[in-house]
């Protein structure tokens, strides 16, 4: 990845060489692909895409071993899962620990990638 020189200079001063090197390594890695299963539609065998690893903080979340072409996946179009970054799933985990009564959540998305969450 070719980062702008002024960005690199500023960020190295801010973070130090070791942490900046870690940042650069992370930016070169292939980003993980995670999905959130729809618990109302994904209970049967074969409903979950194969070769997945659970997301530790979300019962419905899984990491995929590789990024499929979601456009052609009938499971996505049938509503069995939604492509969602695992960090976006963390809020539900926190709320379960802090709030000891039912919580109504509204998860909104807007193209080309904005997300909003409302909890009540």
Predicted regions and their residues:
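S-adenosylmethionine
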Residues: 1-120
């Amino acid at each position: 990845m070719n980062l702008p020189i002024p960005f690199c200079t500023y960020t190295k001063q801010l973070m130090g060489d070791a942490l900046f090197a870690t940042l650069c390594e992370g930016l070169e890695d292939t980003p993980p692909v995670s999905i959130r299963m729809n618990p109302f539609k994904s209970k049967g065998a074969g409903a979950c895409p194969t070769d997945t690893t659970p997301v530790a903080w979300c019962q419905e979340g899984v990491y995929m071993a590789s990024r499929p072409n979601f456009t052609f996946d009938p499971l996505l179009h049938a509503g069995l899962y939604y492509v969602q970054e695992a960090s976006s799933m963390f809020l539900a985990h926190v709320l379960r620990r802090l709030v000891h009564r039912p919580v109504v959540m509204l998860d909104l998305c807007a193209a080309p990638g904005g997300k909003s969450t409302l909890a009540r």
